[in-house]
Each structure stands twice: as structure tokens, then as C-alpha cells.
Design a protein with these regions (language model features):
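Acidic, low-complexity, intrinsically disordered interaction modules
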Residues: 20-71
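Mixed-charge, Lys/Arg-enriched low-complexity segments
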Residues: 2-20, 60-85
Length: 85
């Protein structure tokens, strides 16, 4: 992996249609230049949202990155642990 150090908010901003309130819940951690995936960490749940530069959403698996539904993964990332019980 070749890590990018310049924050790229464009994929998150595009997927959230510029919803600043939700965007501010996230921290950009790094980008992977090899895969084109940006890693955003939710500031409360500490879960990661992985977005490709083209907007596709991924989760890390034992076999590498797997494409997943953005809406479903956004809910997973934002869901507080006590809400998921």
C-alpha cells in the first residue's frame, strides 16, 4: 500500500450530497494510492467508511476489499453501539 497524505474529502462530500453536518462526523485518515480508496473514521463510533475516489463503498475482509452498499455501510458506521442492541 502506498499511503496518500493529502486529505481527499471529495468522495465523502459527493456521496453525502454536501451534508456538512454528517461530513463533520468523520475524520480523513489516509488514502491508498494503489487501490484509490480513501479511509474515513467516524469520530464517535471509531468505525471506518471506505470510499473509492469514484464513490464506490468497500469493507475490509480477510480476502481484501469487498464492495458493499453505501447506504447500508453508512448506517453501520454511524450506528452507536448502544443503538445496535
Amino acid at each position: 500500500m502506498t499511503a496518500a497524505t493529502d486529505a481527499n474529502w471529495a468522495p465523502l462530500e459527493a456521496r453525502l450530497n454536501g451534508d456538512v453536518e454528517v461530513i463533520h462526523e468523520f475524520m480523513w485518515m489516509f488514502g491508498d494510492k494503489d487501490t484509490g480508496v480513501e479511509y474515513y473514521k467516524h469520530s464517535i463510533t471509531r468505525r471506518y467508511l471506505l470510499l473509492h475516489r469514484d464513490g464506490r463503498c468497500f469493507q475490509q475482509s480477510l480476502n481484501g476489499l469487498v464492495e458493499v452498499d453505501f447506504g447500508t455501510d453508512l448506517r453501520r458506521v454511524r450506528e452507536h453501539p448502544e443503538e445496535g442492541r
